[in-house]
Amino acid sequence: MIYVIDCTDKAGHLQTRLDNREAHLSYLAGFDGQLIMAGPFLSATGDMIGSMLIMDFETLQDAELFCANDPYQLAGLFSGVAIRPWRKTLPA
Protein backbone atom coordinates (compact mmCIF):
# COMPACT_ATOMS: atom_id res chain seq x y z
CA MET A 1 0.00 0.00 0.00
CA ILE A 2 1.23 3.49 -0.81
CA TYR A 3 1.18 6.03 2.02
CA VAL A 4 1.58 9.79 1.96
CA ILE A 5 3.33 10.99 5.10
CA ASP A 6 2.74 14.69 5.82
CA CYS A 7 4.95 16.15 8.56
CA THR A 8 4.67 19.68 9.94
CA ASP A 9 7.67 21.23 11.67
CA LYS A 10 7.31 23.02 14.98
CA ALA A 11 7.52 26.78 14.49
CA GLY A 12 11.02 28.13 14.97
CA HIS A 13 12.71 24.73 14.63
CA LEU A 14 14.61 25.19 11.36
CA GLN A 15 17.92 24.64 13.17
CA THR A 16 16.65 21.30 14.53
CA ARG A 17 15.90 20.28 10.94
CA LEU A 18 19.33 21.41 9.73
CA ASP A 19 21.15 19.71 12.61
CA ASN A 20 19.45 16.36 11.90
CA ARG A 21 19.23 16.48 8.10
CA GLU A 22 22.15 14.12 7.37
CA ALA A 23 20.85 11.51 9.83
CA HIS A 24 17.37 11.82 8.28
CA LEU A 25 18.73 11.37 4.74
CA SER A 26 20.81 8.35 5.85
CA TYR A 27 17.70 6.85 7.44
CA LEU A 28 15.73 7.32 4.22
CA ALA A 29 18.52 5.63 2.24
CA GLY A 30 17.75 2.44 4.17
CA PHE A 31 14.27 2.39 2.59
CA ASP A 32 15.43 2.60 -1.03
CA GLY A 33 12.94 0.03 -2.35
CA GLN A 34 10.04 1.65 -0.48
CA LEU A 35 10.76 5.34 -0.93
CA ILE A 36 8.88 6.66 -3.96
CA MET A 37 9.58 10.36 -3.43
CA ALA A 38 10.22 12.79 -0.61
CA GLY A 39 11.02 16.42 -0.01
CA PRO A 40 10.45 19.43 2.22
CA PHE A 41 7.53 21.80 2.29
CA LEU A 42 8.73 25.39 1.93
CA SER A 43 7.59 28.67 3.42
CA ALA A 44 6.93 31.71 1.23
CA THR A 45 10.55 32.72 1.87
CA GLY A 46 11.94 29.30 0.94
CA ASP A 47 12.63 27.94 4.44
CA MET A 48 11.94 24.25 5.06
CA ILE A 49 8.82 23.94 7.25
CA GLY A 50 7.79 20.31 6.92
CA SER A 51 8.19 17.12 4.92
CA MET A 52 6.17 15.02 2.53
CA LEU A 53 7.11 11.42 1.81
CA ILE A 54 5.38 8.97 -0.49
CA MET A 55 6.31 5.44 0.49
CA ASP A 56 5.27 1.83 -0.01
CA PHE A 57 4.63 -0.20 3.15
CA GLU A 58 2.88 -3.51 3.74
CA THR A 59 0.82 -2.12 6.63
CA LEU A 60 -0.10 1.11 8.37
CA GLN A 61 1.84 -0.19 11.37
CA ASP A 62 4.99 -0.40 9.23
CA ALA A 63 4.47 3.22 8.16
CA GLU A 64 3.95 4.26 11.79
CA LEU A 65 7.13 2.46 12.86
CA PHE A 66 9.06 4.15 10.06
CA CYS A 67 7.82 7.56 11.25
CA ALA A 68 8.51 6.84 14.91
CA ASN A 69 12.17 6.06 14.15
CA ASP A 70 12.86 8.94 11.75
CA PRO A 71 15.71 11.05 13.19
CA TYR A 72 13.61 14.18 12.67
CA GLN A 73 10.85 12.70 14.84
CA LEU A 74 13.36 11.52 17.45
CA ALA A 75 14.82 15.06 17.57
CA GLY A 76 11.37 16.51 18.31
CA LEU A 77 11.13 18.45 15.03
CA PHE A 78 7.51 17.74 14.15
CA SER A 79 4.39 19.29 15.62
CA GLY A 80 2.29 16.79 13.69
CA VAL A 81 2.53 13.78 11.40
CA ALA A 82 -0.33 12.48 9.26
CA ILE A 83 -0.08 9.10 7.54
CA ARG A 84 -2.65 8.55 4.82
CA PRO A 85 -3.16 5.57 2.49
CA TRP A 86 -3.11 6.73 -1.12
CA ARG A 87 -3.98 5.35 -4.52
CA LYS A 88 -2.46 6.74 -7.71
CA THR A 89 -5.13 7.49 -10.30
CA LEU A 90 -3.58 9.93 -12.80
CA PRO A 91 -1.76 9.86 -15.04
CA ALA A 92 -2.92 6.38 -15.98
Where in this protein do the model-derived segments appear?
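Conserved, structured core segments of small domains
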Residues: 1-92
